[in-house]
Amino acid sequence: TKKSILGDFTSLHMVVPTLRCNSSCIYCQVARKNRDDHSADMTKQTAKNIVKTIFQSPSPCIKIEFQGGDPSTDFEMVKYIIEEAEWQNLFKKKALDFVICTNLTLLSEKMVQYLKKHNCMISTSLDGPKDLHDINRPLQDKKLDHHAIFESHLSMIRKIWGNNDCASALMTTSKYSLGRFKDIIDEYIRLGFKSIFLRSLNPYGFAKQYKEKIAYPIE
């Protein structure tokens, strides 16, 4: 029937707790806010309404993916949504999963232990070796070494989880990536990733603003 698709209605729900971020990625597709700017933080009432709406989906599976900004800049809201969803699921009895998309740099051991306890997988970005990653994804604090912090925190995360599969990564292709694909793959292998997801630029946000600097022909 025409309505049969509704039985498997969308299971993936992307939630943006905040637009705050500590990175200045050259291709950022959102209107990110500085780390101390709370003007775009989600309220608890909004979060509660979102979770309630998510569980109205007839799908037997629900995956909540936290995006941003970087959700780790408002980790208390991430925790609130996870626990609200788990409470709702006591009654709905769905297969419930969580993913947090983060640059890793603000994750503490306590945060990672919480994510493990609630089975919230980690999705991150790695654009290649240090020089390429730091060109594409500089931190707002220029004194900090993004790639070095990334590598250190990745090791910490895997140690707490006890495996390498808790964190996956994708790379976004800028003009600086072209001709560097062997270097990029070698870096993924060096850091113990078993897969790589290649993402092209989206023609909006900062990628559109700086297209003369970072864009490339579709061909």
Q: Where in the sequence are the language-model features?
A:
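Conserved alpha-helical substructure of the radical SAM core
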Residues: 1-113, 117-118
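A cross-family glycoside hydrolase active-site/sugar-binding cleft signature
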Residues: 16, 65-67, 99-103, 123-127, ...
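Short, solvent-exposed loop/turn segments at secondary-structure junctions
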Residues: 22, 71, 105-106, 129, ...
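Helix N-cap and loop-to-helix transition residues
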Residues: 43, 74, 108, 129, ...
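N-terminal-biased segments
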Residues: 63-70, 128-135, 139
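Glycine-enriched alpha-helix->loop->beta-strand junction motifs that scaffold or abut catalytic
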Residues: 116-122, 192-194
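Radical SAM enzyme [4Fe-4S]-AdoMet core and its adjacent flexible, acidic
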Residues: 131-151, 155, 159-219
